[in-house]
């Protein structure tokens, strides 16, 4: 009988898109698989990914992650052409695809990548159905965040 693999402590998150939550209202989140090549998996294990400018496009009833950068390792194979900005296919159920395509086409939403992470041995992408924020919405968010910090500071000093 084989031994169980030891749990590796640490974060399963490979990359996050913090800008997305600042620039968009995230209405709904989905988890999607990601179709990768071998060198991309090795680079993701090393944490060399950037999804800050990535979004999802739809072609022929399929979803593709566009704009994500996976930097190849220096020791990558020479007979494989490593394309860091390659468009990668997202693996979703038909029902989820239909829902996303409908929201993008009818309601004017966009779909952005929020994070890339490991789930067991699989790389998953958390995507969000989003609507763009206006400048005044961003300012309101900043005001709310600052007031929350001030309120916590006031309550801390009031309890002394």
Swiss-Prot record:
Keyword Cytoplasm recorded: yes
Domain of life of the organism encoding this protein: Bacteria
HAMAP family on file: SmpB
GO cellular component, one term: cytosol
CDD domains registered for this protein in UniProt: SmpB
Biological process (GO), any one: trans-translation
Record-linked InterPro entries: SmpB, SsrA-bd_prot, SsrA-bd_prot_CS
Protein's organism: Yersinia enterocolitica serotype O:8 / biotype 1B (strain NCTC 13174 / 8081)
Keyword Cytoplasm recorded: yes
GO molecular function: RNA binding
Functional description taken from the UniProt entry: Required for rescue of stalled ribosomes mediated by trans-translation. Binds to transfer-messenger RNA (tmRNA), required for stable association of tmRNA with ribosomes. tmRNA and SmpB together mimic tRNA shape, replacing the anticodon stem-loop with SmpB. tmRNA is encoded by the ssrA gene; the 2 termini fold to resemble tRNA(Ala) and it encodes a 'tag peptide', a short internal open reading frame. During trans-translation Ala-aminoacylated tmRNA acts like a tRNA, entering the A-site of stalled ribosomes, displacing the stalled mRNA.
Principal location listed in the UniProt entry: cytoplasm
Name of the featured protein: SsrA-binding protein
Alphabetic keyword roster: Cytoplasm, RNA-binding
């Amino acid at each position: 009988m084989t031994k169980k693999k030891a749990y590796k402590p640490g974060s399963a998150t490979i990359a996050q898109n913090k800008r997305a939550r600042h620039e968009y209202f995230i209405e709904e989140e989905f988890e999607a698989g990601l179709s990768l090549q071998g060198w991309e998996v090795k680079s993701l294990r090393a944490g060399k990914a950037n999804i800050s400018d990535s979004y999802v496009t739809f072609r022929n009833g399929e979803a593709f992650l566009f704009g994500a950068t996976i930097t190849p390792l220096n020791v990558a194979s020479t007979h494989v052409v490593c394309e860091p900005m390659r468009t990668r296919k997202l693996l979703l159920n038909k029902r989820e695809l239909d829902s996303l395509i409908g929201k993008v086409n009818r309601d004017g939403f966009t779909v952005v990548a929020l994070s890339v992470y490991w789930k067991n041995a699989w790389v998953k992408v958390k995507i969000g159905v989003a609507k763009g924020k206006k400048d005044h919405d961003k300012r309101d968010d900043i005001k709310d965040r600052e007031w929350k910090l001030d309120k916590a500071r006031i309550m801390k000093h009031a309890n002394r």
